[in-house]
Amino acid sequence: MRGILVTGALGQIGSELVPALRDHYCVDRVIASDLCVTQAQPETKGPYENLDCTQPHQILEVVRRHDVGTIYHLAALLSATAEKRPLAAWDINLGGLYNVLEAARQHRCQVFFPSTIGAFGPSTPRYQTPQVTIQRPTTMYGVTKVSGELLCDYYAARFGVDSRGLRLPGLISYVAPPGGGTTDYAVEIFYQALRYMHYTCFLGPNTRLDMMYMPDAIRSMVALMEADIATLRHRSAYNVTAMSITPEELAAEIRKHIPKFAIDYQVDPVRQAIADSWPCSVDDSAAREDWGFAPQFNLAGMVTDMLARLGERQRPTKGEIDSSSRGVRWQSTA
């Protein structure tokens, strides 16, 4: 079996994708990579490479040395961070993808590229956004993702690179902390609910966005990469979703488990503007028809599982509760 390289392996998706791939295939053939290692992370317990995707020679060297046949290219700046650092976002998100596709062209690799609901914009139909529609994003993150979709299509048509991708919604994970995305509230809320029974949300209460629980996202990536290419009509950018929710709806579901949980709102105008430019829901019928996409978690199931898995790891001690009530804020050491 040829190697599987995961770039951005220490990020939100990579932290769960790498172990899943190692369980599904072979530990020694899944190579995790990222810019650096800051602590003993599980991703480094198999093959690991320090890799800067903006440096093409580094990618080529890793691909050659490990005989890589598949690349999951996850390295990117997320939406809110990309707005603060637009030039870096262009260099990392698009320049890094170009370097990966070039390595794939030279070494006949399959490539997975994660696109996003951020690839759409305010002129796109907001409800049941079609698979093929207007894509005029108003953020640098979205611009790099639309460009990435087109670049993958180009390399497939021009050079025969087997590139595949998903337009991912907001992802909810209990493994990795939030990473600078507009949908991060849907992760932060669980930590705060368990710690303080209170959360201040940076998006408005009725901001409706598509979401997916990370286990469903991981299964979907692997399923797409294993699918028969002859069935894939939209190979580089399939719409996928599992639920369309608002902060208020998520809080209400959490309240079924933590009745005293309270939420209030301090809207961040930058992130709210980003969210308002995205679809409220997408049509993922093409993914369901072409390769059998079928998420297992709805809102209720996701909330139940998130709270159970964070559980005792996040619950405060009595001393922490007392400190919190006196205005002392708990800080994670993670």
Regions from the PLM with identified roles:
Residues 3-23:
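N-terminal Rossmann NAD(P)H-binding glycine-rich loop of SDR-like oxidoreductase domains
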